[in-house]
Amino acid sequence: MKMGTAKRSKRIEVYDPDKVKQFNPETKKMLNAYKKDMTLRELSPGTISGYMSDLNQWLIYVLEEQDNRSVLELDEDDLTDFFYFCKTEGNNTRRMRRRYSSISAFYKYLRKKRKVAENPMEFIDRPVKDTDVTQQTYLTMEQV
């Protein structure tokens, strides 16, 4: 490991195009509309890709663990279950924060479009402590 670099968190690779095809039809329609909205707002391709990756991984979890319910039916407890799954699978604070941001922004969009009365992410606390592990390296007297 290079000096001063943090360990990367474990990626949860659950993306599967066949599973994406099985998403709740109502959810899939809203997800596609959200992607168009991000493009129209001229978010960077990297941001759109990152958000869509997070959302697809979350929705695969919903498909497999939460009966493929519509995102309109999910509540704070359902979202907390997903975040707990991510954390126990090894996601670090930075990755967890992005997941929170991706899902929260999606619900903010749904609220703006009057699809949901409130954003279930609003009362979920986000991780604040950065738990990335940095390996410290010390120079010997000969190296100084």
Locate the predicted segments by residue.
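N-terminal acidic, proline/glycine-rich, low-complexity intrinsically disordered segments
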Residues: M1-K7
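N-terminal core-binding DNA-recognition domain of tyrosine recombinases/integrases
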Residues: V14-V20, L31-Q135
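Short, intrinsically disordered, charge-balanced linker/junction segments flanking boundaries
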Residues: T140-V144
